[in-house]
Curated annotation (Swiss-Prot):
A single GO BP: formation of cytoplasmic translation initiation complex
Biased composition range(s): Low complexity: 196-208, 897-911
Pfam family, one: PCI
Provenance organism: Drosophila persimilis (Fruit fly)
Protein's recorded name: Eukaryotic translation initiation factor 3 subunit C
Principal localisation: cytoplasm
Length: 911
C-alpha cells in the first residue's frame, strides 16, 4: 500500500494481495475554517532548534540520495550542509561549548565511507555516467578537504560509533527517533528494512531468542527506515489541507502526554542497552563495529629474529611509501615509533636509533603536504621532542657521523666508526621555519601567541645542540649556516647587561649578547663563501650594535661594508633585513643626539609612505589590479612575526621630530629664497596642509603634536614647542617606549631650546641692531657659553651676518641683507620678469617664424621689404635681451653698493 495514504498500512505481503483505495475527502472540507482559530497558540522555536532542524533535514536528504547513488544531488546537498553548519556555528559554540554535534560527525563518517566504497569499486565506477563520475571526483575532494577540521572527532566516533551522549539524545538531535522507529516498525514489517545487530561469537554458537531480536530491532533501526517513517507520519498526521498549514497548537495535555511517552521510550532504551552491557560482561559476545575495520599491519613475523638488517629492511619498506598517493601518513609515523621501540628493546645500537629518529623527523615534515600552512600542534611538540632526542644521542656518541655526503651503500651500523646518511642541519632549518609559520598563524594579541612564543626556548636549545655537534665535526660552511640561525634568534633582543657593563655596574668579564654576536659574526666574515650569509650576518650585527647604542661601531660597519651600493641585487628577505637595520640605526642615532644622521637613515623609509610594507610588518590595502592574489600570498609569507616588529608610530615620530629640528631653522634662514629646497618632503607637506586649514583645533594625534610644535618653533617659542613634544600623551605613545626614556626627553628639550634660538635669530635679525647674549641665555634657559658657541658657529658658517663684542657680551647685527620690503620687491621683480618671458615665448609661438625670415616670406622681389636691411627680423628677442641686460646691470649696481656698505662697517669696527 502506498505510504502517502491517510490510513495505516499492513505488511508488504498483505498490501500486495489486497488493493486499498485512497479515501476521497470532501474538497470543501479541505478549506473549512472554524471559530477556534483564535485559540490556536503560536509555537516559538529557539535558534538552536531551527539550526538543528535544518541540519537534520539536509542529512536525511543526503541519506536518501546515497540510497539511490544520486551523486550530483549528494554533492549539492553536501554543499548545503556545510553552509548550514557554518550558520549554526554560533549556536554550537554557545550551547555545546564548541563541541560538534555527534549526529553531524556521524553524517560525515557515513558520507566518507560511502565515497570510499564507491571509489574502491573500480568496476562500478566504470559503469557510472559521465555526470556521476565528475560529481564523484568533486565530492571526494571536497569531503576530504572538509573533514580535516574534524579528524579528532571522527577518530573518536569511529572508536565508539554506537555510543551517543544522553544530552544529544534527549535534547536536540534525535528526540523523535524513538517514535519514528516504533511507527516504522508497526507500519512496515519488512525484512529488508530491519538490520539486526551483527554479533560475533567468541564461544560456541548460541541460539538467540526471537524476542530479543524483535526488541533490539526497535532500537537499531537504520537511518533509511527512520526517514521513510517520519515522512509517512507527516503525511498521515493531517486529515485535510488546512491542518497542514496551521501552526501546531500547544495544549498542555497533549504536550504532557507526548513528554511522558518519550520518557517511557527512553527508559526502555536505557534498560535494553544496560541489559546488553550486562550480557557482554560474560565475555562470550562482542558487538561488531559498523564499517570496514582497518587492521594495523604486523611489524615482524612471530618467530622472526630481530636484528639490524631486518630492522633496516623494515625501515626502508615503511619509508618507500613516502610521497605516494593514498599513503596513511599518521600510520607511517606510528609504525616508525613502534620500530624505534623494537630497536631499543633488542639493543640494536645507537646508530640504528639515530637513523630511525631521522626518518621520524622526515615523516612528521611530510605529514603536512602544503608548505605554506603550519603544522599541527601535536606534530610540532612531537617534532621538538624527537629532534632534541636525536641530537643528544649524536653528542653522546662521538663515533657516529651523520652527513648528507654519505651514500646509502656506504652506511655503517655495526662497527665503529658509524656512518649515517642524513642532514640534521637541514632538519633544524626546517624546524625553525615551521616555528616562524606557527607564530604567523596565531593572533598576535591572543594568549596562543604567547604560549607559542614560549617554544622559542626549545627551538634555540635545539639549535644550540646542532651547533655543538657541528663545532665538533662540521665543515666551515655548515657552521656558518647554523651560526646564522642562532644570530637570527639573537640579533633583535635587547640585553640590559650591555649598558650596565658600559657604566661599570657589572664586572668587565661578564659575557653579554654583544660578545656572542661578535664571535659568531666574525667567524662568518672569515669563513663564509656565499655573499648572502655574510650580508645577513653584517646586517644583524649592525642591528644589534644599534639596539645597544653602539653608534660608532654600527656606523663604521655600514660604511665599510658598502651595503647600500649593492643591496638592490639581494633577495627580498635580505632587503627586508636591510630596511629593519636602517630603521633601528636611525633610532640609535636619535638617542645619541645625532639628529641629522637619524633623519638621513629614516628618510628613505618614510618618504615612500609605505614603511609597513618595507619592514614586512603588514600589507597596505591596494587597488584592484596593483597586486595579484599570488603576489599577496607570497608577501604574506615574508612577513615578520609580531614580536620582532618595530613600532611604526615611534619610527614616524622620530623622523618628524628630526625633520622639524632641521627644517624650521632652514626655513627661517631662507625665508625669501625662491629656490629654497626641502629637507623633508613629508614634513613639509604636513606643515603646509596644516597651514591651509582655516580652523585648527588642539592637537590630538602624534602628527598634529609635531606640526603644532613646529609652528611654535617658527616663532621662537621654545616652551610651547617643548610642551607639544613632551607631554603625557606623547610619553605614553612614543617616548616611554625608549630604554632610559628620561634621558631621551632631556635631550629633546635641549635640542628644542637650541634650534628655537637659531630660528629666533634668523627671523628677527633684521629687527635688532645688537642683542645681549645674557638676555638670550635667560630667554632660552641655556648657559651663556652655550649661547656664545651657537652664535659663533652661525657667524663662521655665514648663516648670520653679525659680529661678537666680547667686552659688552653683545651680538652686533650687520645690515648686509636687504630689509623685508626690499626682499619682497626683489622677489616681485623676479616673478614679473619670468612672467614677461613666458608671455613673449607664447607670442613667438603664435606668430610663427614670419619675422625671422630675412625676405619677409620670399616677397623681396616685389619691393615689399626693400631697403629694410632685415630690421624687423627677431624684434621680440632683441627687446627681451636688452631688458635682461638692463636688469643685470641694476642688480650688479645694487650688489656693489652692499659690498661698499659692508666694507665701511668693517672699517668702523677696526677703528
Amino acid at each position: 500500500m502506498s505510504r502517502f495514504f491517510a490510513n495505516g498500512s499492513d505488511s508488504e505481503s498483505e498490501s500486495s494481495e489486497e488493493e486499498v483505495q485512497a479515501p476521497n475527502f470532501n474538497k470543501a472540507s479541505a478549506f473549512q475554517f472554524s471559530d477556534d482559530e483564535e485559540e490556536v497558540k503560536r509555537v516559538v522555536r529557539s535558534t538552536k532548534e531551527k539550526r538543528y532542524e535544518n541540519l537534520t533535514s539536509i542529512i536525511k536528504t543526503i541519506r536518501n540520495h546515497k540510497k539511490i547513488k544520486d551523486i550530483p544531488n549528494t554533492l549539492s546537498s553536501f554543499e548545503d550542509l556545510t553552509r548550514a553548519y557554518t550558520k549554526a556555528l554560533p549556536v554550537i559554540s554557545k550551547e555545546e561549548n564548541g563541541i560538534t554535534p555527534r549526529f553531524y560527525i556521524r553524517c560525515l563518517a557515513e558520507l566518507e565511507d560511502f565515497i570510499n566504497e564507491i571509489w574502491e569499486d573500480r568496476e562500478g565506477r566504470r559503469n557510472l555516467s559521465k555526470n556521476n563520475t565528475k560529481s564523484l571526483g568533486t565530492l571526494r575532494q571536497k569531503v576530504r578537504k572538509y573533514i580535516k577540521d574534524f579528524e579528532e572527532d571522527l577518530s573518536r566516533f569511529r572508536e565508539a560509533p554506537d555510543q551517543e551522549s544522553e544530552a544529544e539524545d534527549e535534547e536536540a538531535h534525535v528526540s523523535d527517533a524513538g517514535e519514528a522507529a516504533d511507527d516504522s516498525y508497526a507500519g512496515f514489517k519488512k525484512e529488508a528494512s530491519v538490520t539486526a545487530p551483527k554479533i560475533a561469537k567468541s564461544a560456541p554458537a548460541k541460539s538467540v531468542p526471537a524476542d530479543d531480536e524483535d526488541s533490539d530491532d526497535s532500537i537499531d533501526w537504520d537511518s533509511d527506515s527512520e526517514s521513510e517513517t517520519e515522512s509517512s507520519e507527516d503525511e498521515n498526521q493531517y486529515q485535510n489541507m488546512r491542518e497542514r498549514f496551521l501552526k501546531r497548537s500547544t495544549e498542555k495535555g497533549e504536550d504532557k502526554g507526548d513528554d511522558d511517552k518519550r520518557k517511557d521510550k527512553r527508559k526502555e532504551q536505557k534498560l535494553k542497552i544496560r541489559k546488553r552491557a550486562e550480557d557482554d560482561e560474560d565475555g562470550e559476545w562482542e558487538t561488531v563495529v559498523k564499517g570496514h575495520v582497518v587492521e594495523k599491519p604486523k611489524m615482524f613475523e612471530k618467530d622472526a629474529e630481530i636484528d639490524i638488517p631486518l630492522v633496516l629492511a623494515k625501515l626502508v619498506e615503511i619509508m618507500s611509501a613516502r610521497g605516494k598517493k593514498r599513503t596513511d601518513r599518521r600510520l607511517q609515523i606510528d609504525l616508525l615509533f613502534e620500530l624505534r621501540d623494537i630497536s631499543d628493546q633488542h639493543n640494536l645500537g645507537v646508530p640504528v636509533s639515530v637513523k630511525i629518529h631521522f626518518n621520524i623527523i622526515s615523516a612528521i615534515f611530510d605529514y603536512n603536504q602544503k608548505i605554506s600552512e603550519p603544522m599541527k600542534m601535536e606534530h610540532w611538540a612531537l617534532l621538538l621532542e624527537v629532534m632534541q632526542s636525536m641530537m643528544k644521542l649524536l653528542l653522546a656518541n662521538a663515533d657516529i657521523s651523520i652527513s648528507e655526503s654519505v651514500a646509502e651503500e656506504h652506511e655503517e651500523y655495526i662497527t665503529a666508526p658509524f656512518y649515517i646518511r642524513g642532514c640534521p642541519l637541514a632538519a633544524v632549518e626546517r624546524l625553525d621555519d615551521e616555528f616562524t609559520k606557527l607564530l604567523k598563524e596565531c593572533d598576535p594579541h591572543s594568549n596562543d601567541y604567547v604560549s607559542r612564543l614560549k617554544d622559542e626556548m626549545n627551538v634555540v636549545k635545539t639549535i644550540e645542540l646542532v651547533l655543538q655537534y657541528f663545532e665538533q665535526c662540521g665543515n666551515p660552511n655548515e657552521r656558518c649556516r647554523i651560526y646564522l640561525r642562532k644570530i637570527e634568534h639573537l640579533y633583535y633582543k635587547f640585553d640590559p647587561e650591555v649598558l650596565k657593563k658600559k657604566r661599570g655596574e657589572v664586572p668587565a668579564t661578564t659575557a653579554t649578547s654583544v660578545d656572542v654576536m661578535d664571535k659568531l659574526c666574525k667567524f662568518i666574515y672569515a669563513k663564509d663563501d656565499t655573499d648572502r650569509i655574510r650580508t645577513r650576518a653584517i646586517l644583524a650585527h649592525i642591528y644589534h650594535h644599534a639596539m645597544h647604542d653602539n653608534w660608532f661601531q654600527a656606523r663604521d660597519l655600514v660604511l665599510m661594508s658598502h651595503l647600500q651600493d649593492n643591496i638592490d641585487a639581494a633577495d627580498p628577505a635580505t632587503r627586508i633585513l636591510y630596511n629593519r637595520m636602517m630603521a633601528n640605526l636611525g633610532l640609535c642615532a636619535f638617542r645619541q643626539e645625532n639628529v641629522k644622521d637619524a633623519h638621513h637613515c629614516l628618510v628613505d623609509l618614510m618618504v615612500t609612505g609605505k614603511p609597513k610594507e618595507l619592514l614586512a610588518q603588514g600589507l597596505l590595502p591596494q587597488r584592484q589590479h596593483e597586486r595579484s592574489a599570488e603576489q599577496e600570498k607570497i608577501e604574506k609569507q615574508r612577513q615578520m612575526p609580531f614580536h620582532m616588529h618595530i613600532n611604526l608610530e615611534l619610527l614616524e615620530c622620530v623622523y618628524l621630530v628630526s625633520a622639524m629640528l632641521l627644517e624650521i631653522p632652514y626655513i627661517a634662514a631662507h625665508e625669501f629664497d625662491a629656490r629654497r629646497r626641502m629637507i623633508s618632503k613629508t614634513f613639509y607637506q604636513q606643515l603646509r596642509s596644516s597651514e591651509r586649514q582655516s580652523l585648527v583645533g588642539p592637537p590630538e594625534s602624534m602628527r598634529e603634536h609635531v606640526v603644532a610644535a613646529a609652528k611654535a618653533m617658527r616663532c621662537g617659542n621654545w616652551q610651547a614647542c617643548a610642551n607639544f613634544i613632551v607631554n603625557k600623551k606623547m610619553n605614553t605613545k612614543v617616548w616611554d617606549l625608549f630604554y632610559e626614556s628620561d634621558r631621551v626627553r632631556e635631550m629633546l628639550v635641549k635640542f628644542i631650546k637650541e634650534e628655537s634660538l637659531r630660528t629666533y635669530l634668523f627671523t628677527y635679525s633684521n629687527v635688532y641692531t645688537s642683542i645681549s647674549i645674557p638676555s638670550l641665555a635667560q630667554m632660552y634657559e641655556l648657559p651663556v657659553p652655550k649661547v656664545h658657541s651657537i652664535i659663533s658657529k652661525m657667524i663662521i658658517n655665514e648663516e648670520l651676518m653679525a659680529s661678537l663684542d666680547d667686552p659688552s657680551e653683545t651680538v652686533v647685527m650687520h645690515r648686509s641683507e636687504p630689509s623685508r620690503l626690499q626682499a619682497l620687491a626683489m622677489q616681485f621683480v623676479d616673478k614679473v620678469t619670468n612672467l614677461v618671458d613666458v608671455n613673449e615665448k607664447v607670442f613667438d609661438m603664435k606668430q610663427g617664424n614670419f619675422f625671422q625670415r630675412g625676405n619677409m616670406g620670399n616677397r623681396g622681389d616685389r619691393g615689399y621689404n626693400r631697403n629694410q636691411n632685415n630690421q624687423g627680423g627677431n624684434w621680440g628677442g632683441q627687446r627681451r635681451d636688452n631688458r635682461n641686460q638692463r636688469n643685470r646691470n641694476q642688480r650688479g649696481h645694487h650688489k656693489n653698493q652692499q659690498q661698499q656698505q659692508q666694507q665701511q662697517v668693517q672699517t668702523i669696527d677696526e677703528e
